[in-house]
Amino acid sequence: MRARLLLLALVTTASLLAAMTAACFGGAVPAPTPRRTATAVATASTARPVAARLPDARVEALLRRAVCWLDDPTSAGTCVPPSPDALAAIDEMGRSGDPRLVAPLIDMLNLDLSWRGPLDAALVRLTGEQSTDARGWREWLLGQGQANAEGPPGYARWKARLLALTATPETKPPYEALFGATLDTSTLAALHWTGVQPDANRPLHDPANVNARAQRYLPPTDLVYGVVIGSEARAYPQRIIAWHGVVNDTLNGHAIVVVHCLPCGGAVAFERGQSGGSTAAGKPRDFGTTGLALHSRSLIFDTVESRLWDGFSGVALGGPGSPGSPRAALTPLPVFTTTWSDWQARHTTTTVLDIATGVVRDYSAGAATRDEVDSTRALHPVQADTRLAEKEPVIGVVPASGPPLAFRLAEVQTRQLVTAGAPGAGVVALSEGPGLAAGVYAAGGVHFVRAEGNGSGFAAIDDAGGRWAMREQALVQVGTGKELPALPWQQGYWFAWAGAHPETEVVRSGTQP
């Protein structure tokens, strides 16, 4: 789907970025030094000027002039098109030589308000670089490490006001509260607006569900994301949750959140009422969508504490504490990505979301994901890691010890059994077969040698001939009931996993059994 927001009826809608985020491993290839995007930016002939930093008061004045500073964001229509004074301020920013102004100029390019030409010229003067588009400038910022530089004074509040230019009389985006004093400058500079207002995708809250036999809209081959807690199983169809981004749900008495990160190519689930998930008051968190992306990973926010979270990794970006302090993290839950028929065969008593969500959407197969699937690149700016293709599907895991690991999903689904680490001492990635469920488990001293069967009849075979059935929460040995615990894995595109875990090692296929 291609979400397009009319900026007060004065912004050209055709220029807005398509998005649907309102709503992510034996021998291994070590993580490299982050790479700059190769084709987005070329060195310009304009030499970068050398100048002293401007006084803070002067920087603040330029930023206010450039974006038509308003106390009432709903009156921002008077800023469009930019006034001669705003354009003069942009030109002065480019000639200033002050590197603190690079990120704000790129932020302004994120919105198409008839100022592309002046902004490009200012950035060329200020950086000595040039780019073909706004995305290229953002990726240059990420790849060159400029996002780690000191930001201008009042940067968080200024960027919140900049994005408020997208507001309408009906919306009051909580950007100022979300950016807050504890969001570090490097993160703030990397935040990219996707063209969608917070909660515009209508997150679901304890949506209605039905038993498997009662549903009438899912064909056997439809993709679902399955979650199991205790004895209860529930399927979250892609065709539904891809529209909404966030599902705040309760399963077997546990408050959970299922996040579909459209740009990341998958869904993840977390506890939202247990350790790390509950609010300071001890209540389950309630999450919404922000319309913001960090390295093309959808960001969500806690609607009670106005706190930003990475919707793919489940890590908080800000909130109580000071910048640089340990960040809170949600407890991840294993998610099986598989077909409806496979899930139903595994869990005959499963429930599934009712198609009657109370929201009018085209819930036909593929409608919500069409634009993302058709794109060969990440939907939004990312920092390149060229060890794998940007949108190579992977299954990632953070073991109890050692670096994060990434398995190529195609290899796991084809081979059905891929190990990492010494026999019996590492982890094992398993799959029922192409297009079916995959998961990662601790080897626990067991040496797995091959896989047999497909679908619900799949079994992993150890070197003593023992058969192990793949379950969401553990590998279970047939006959003895012995269990090897599941490691909370995440399935999505390479860029999403590598961006959240840059120290990741990629499992080498040549060392697998």
PLM-predicted stretches and their roles:
Residues 9-21:
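Bacterial N-terminal signal peptides
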